[in-house]
From Swiss-Prot:
Stable under extremes of temperature. Residues 73-105 form a propeptide. This is Flower-specific defensin. The gene is D1. InterPro entries: Defensin_plant, Scorpion_toxin-like, Scorpion_toxin-like_sf. The lineage of its organism: Eukaryota, Viridiplantae, Streptophyta, Embryophyta, Tracheophyta. Disulfide bonds join 28-72, 39-59, 45-66, 49-68. It comes from Nicotiana alata (Winged tobacco). Belongs to the DEFL family. One of its GO terms (cellular component) is vacuole. Residues 1-25 form the signal peptide. It comes from the Eukaryota.
Amino acid sequence: MARSLCFMAFAILAMMLFVAYEVQARECKTESNTFPGICITKPPCRKACISEKFTDGHCSKILRRCLCTKPCVFDEKMTKTGAEILAEEAKTLAAALLEEEIMDN
């Protein structure tokens, strides 16, 4: 009886840990509107992104653009039209594919 109770407690604890790691906000990225020129180091990019109300920013590896990041919020996606969402996702996908293609060569 004691062993099954101990096993049950362990199973519940393990399940809680696995679930906690899965519940993570997706990170949304967008190019900075205020950062001028080519992005070389993170601090100026991060400063520009924070001034634009994002949580962080970094330079893209290949295209050297300043990308601002923040946790995705469901409500923001609902306020945009389908065409706007598709256009943003297409730009992000195109940049990711270009970087991947360049890295593979």
